[in-house]
């Protein structure tokens, strides 16, 4: 099963088996107005049931993150690697400080902002 690349409040990951069992075998256009982490979308997509998808959420930062992952995956991965190196290299005592510094940061690039969203 495909899993979302981030955690999101109100996520539907636990409901995926039930929703997939009740979903039609073919969905011409899947519309998700509250995508969150996208657990349902990813499960349906990997099952091959979706022909076209329209994803939305009221959280602009979240939607920008989805666009960056779709359109600039290499940039997002590079930015995440920098965050991971700083966080994991800091040691357990300093990781809280790193987390709060990342949370307070304002990355200059779209990929950097997407990486921050995923990291947090």
Q: Where do the PLM segments sit?
A:
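Class I S-adenosyl-L-methionine-dependent methyltransferase module
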Residues: 42, 46-120
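S-adenosyl-L-methionine
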Residues: 1-35, 39-43, 48
């Amino acid at each position: 099963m495909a899993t979302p690349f981030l955690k999101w409040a109100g996520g539907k990951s636990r409901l995926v088996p039930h929703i997939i069992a009740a979903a039609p075998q073919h969905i011409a256009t899947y519309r998700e107005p509250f995508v969150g982490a996208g657990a349902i979308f990813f499960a349906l997509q990997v099952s091959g049931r979706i022909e076209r998808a329209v994803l939305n959420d009221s959280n602009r930062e979240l939607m920008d993150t989805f666009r960056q992952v779709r359109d600039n995956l290499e940039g997002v991965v590079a930015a995440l690697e920098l965050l991971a190196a700083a966080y994991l290299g800091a040691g357990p005592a300093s990781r809280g400080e790193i987390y709060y510094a990342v949370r307070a940061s304002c990355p200059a690039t779209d990929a950097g902002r997407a990486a921050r969203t995923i990291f947090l």
